[in-house]
Amino acid sequence: MVDIVVTGLSANSVPYIEALERQRALHADVVAGRAQDTVILLEHPSVYTAGRRTEPEDRPRDGTPVIDVDRGGRITWHGPGQLVGYPIVRLPEPLDVVAHVRRLEDALIALLADLDVASYRVDGRSGVWIRGAAPDGSPRDEKVAAIGVRVAERVTMHGFALNCSNAFDAYDRIVPCGIRDAGVTSISRAIGRTVTPADVVPLLRPHLVRALSSNGSAMPATAPLSSVAGARA
């Protein structure tokens, strides 16, 4: 069984470094058998974080601070209106990090289906995507959820960031996830009404429990799928 813990939403958002310390402490407890598998759900105040694959050209050019972290992937933004999930779970043997990423994607795709949002995977790119339009009107993939994870001693850290009702100006200062030929979107933009992280939590909870309690068997997703290249944002 997976425990879902909501630690701070909206005005009670949790600073990134504080949440990272909580992750590390819980990770140590799960590794040692002192705690069960847990997903932490929260919002952060506005912050940029950079995974191990971040390139210099991905970063803000104006010197805006960026927190470098030990997850996969490249640079991304967290902030108000975005639901962040940190699954601290023990993976089965044989270790398969990509399968873990797929399970997270499955849960998010199922949640979006509950909201009548059609979402999917993109070959070679992790995360969850929605079909959108570029400024010139041409169709393009737009990321609604980013994923970046780390595994140590068979226990995961970091996780997903799901855009619910956030603004998009912070993305203009970076190359989100190092991807230049796609956009970003949110649930609220996709369905034309405001859907906050607090609205999403009760809908997402059962999908996370089901996906992460599946003992390593990737759940069938509810939307068109393609392969995931790796555990990155």
From Swiss-Prot:
Q: Where does substrate bind?
A: R71, G72, G73, R74, I75, T76, W77, H78, A146, I147, G148, G159, F160, A161
Pfam families assigned: LplA-B_cat
Please report the stretch or stretches of sequence annotated as the BPL/LPL catalytic domain: 33-216
Q: Which GO terms describe its molecular function?
A: lipoyl(octanoyl) transferase activity
Q: Which reaction does it catalyse?
A: octanoyl-[ACP] + L-lysyl-[protein] = N(6)-octanoyl-L-lysyl-[protein] + holo-[ACP] + H(+)
Give the superkingdom in one word.
Answer: Bacteria
Q: Where in the cell is it found?
A: Cytoplasm
- SUPFAM superfamilies, per the entry: Class II aaRS and biotin synthetases
**Uppermost EC category:** transferase
Site annotation (Lowers pKa of active site Cys) points to K143
Active site (UniProt): C177 (acyl-thioester intermediate)
A GO BP entry: protein modification process
Sum up the protein's function in the record's words.
Catalyzes the transfer of endogenously produced octanoic acid from octanoyl-acyl-carrier-protein onto the lipoyl domains of lipoate-dependent enzymes. Lipoyl-ACP can also act as a substrate although octanoyl-ACP is likely to be the physiological substrate.
Q: What NCBIfam families does this protein map onto? A: lipB, PRK14345.1
| This protein's name | Octanoyltransferase
Q: Which organism is it from?
A: Clavibacter michiganensis subsp. michiganensis (strain NCPPB 382)
Q: What is the lineage of its organism?
A: Bacteria, Bacillati, Actinomycetota, Actinomycetes, Micrococcales
Instruction: Name the gene for this chain.
Output: lipB
